[in-house]
């Protein structure tokens, strides 16, 4: 944990931003519509909700797409090279759109911009971009927008990530579900991961503020909250009065919101206390995303994961002993520097042993500034590609077996909308985190519906209303 205390953005600073918002509302040449393009994790998705909330307060309406917006903001990710390339490709595409709409404003923000020198590189290479800012400057969007509107050159703001900003407006994507960020940053420094460098060191919000936010969301009719943090299991360590994540969850369980989810968790910080709280809770869903990353001890050591295979499997065992029907998902990387065929086989055997309900699988992507990027014996692309296909095949087999256990059981599904494959089926997520589709209508959207599971296909369960 960093010795430096996080900087809490004061009410005076937030009021200053509100004044900038009012100034922009009165400007005749200010954009009338916006569109936020989001890449990456749920933390980014929630950041985009906050950005959209501020843009809404500036008097802008959300545009359906980039082509029809007066202001387009890219909230970027840099966890993998592909995410960066996608974002930059879409920024380039807007250059042509601007030829048709000279008043179009373009902004780029988020994790990619937080990397050293990246903002300057973007503005040099993409001279049509109007503003660029990092993860620590999200709350400053009104000020940066005003500067960009009043200036004939691009505005850049990238500060060190040691802040906590609360009380910002939020334009939620859904009325029935909401995110709550409980902490920011990460102190783990896994050798493949750039997150600590772009999100900063760990810093936790006060538990009282989090509980207050949950109560407000309950009063607003929210049926599900997802608690967010790069490593929620280490929540509370830097607070003046330390609070464990398990203690926070217990307090939130008492608030009475029907469904509580959280991510992401680090296996080394998964405590028996947390497992016990989950097992005896009323509202914490029986699902757990527990990234393993690899099945070989030597690779885990070089990844700086601070656990070995046996310790990880012990956590899985304890979770299943306490919550037998728990839904388990994970993240896995193939092609980490120096990974041998034998070590890769250890990953496959672990996947078979655990039997995950779902797995997010990735080919290792070197990130400048991380320890693994400097390691020798980088795995050839063709080898990594073959291995990921093997992993996907094994996981698909395991997933089929895992999902069959739900057939004949009952699930409570929070309906999110119509299925993409049928206009007579609705879709949502069940208690165990799995996607469930069943025949329904528009009136089901946003409601919790009890269904009987009658089938399983790919990564989706099918059901019938009870």
Feature map (PLM): residue ranges:
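Proteins enriched for Cys/Gly/acidic motifs involved in redox and nucleic-acid/cofactor modification
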Residues: 1-235, 273, 288, 310-321, ...
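Terminal RNA-binding accessory module
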Residues: 2-3, 374-466
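Generic beta-strand/beta-sheet core signal
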Residues: 37, 109, 195, 228-230, ...
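Short glycine-enriched, charge-decorated loop/helix-capping segments at active-site entrances
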Residues: 78-79, 199-200, 239-242, 301-307, ...
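Conserved SAM/AdoMet-binding glycine-rich loop
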Residues: 106-108, 117, 219-341, 352
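Short flexible coil/turn linkers enriched for glycine and charged/polar residues
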Residues: 173-176, 186-188, 284, 294, ...
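Conserved, mostly hydrophobic/aromatic
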Residues: 190, 210, 227, 262, ...
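Aromatic/acidic polysaccharide-binding cleft in carbohydrate-active enzymes
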Residues: 361-377
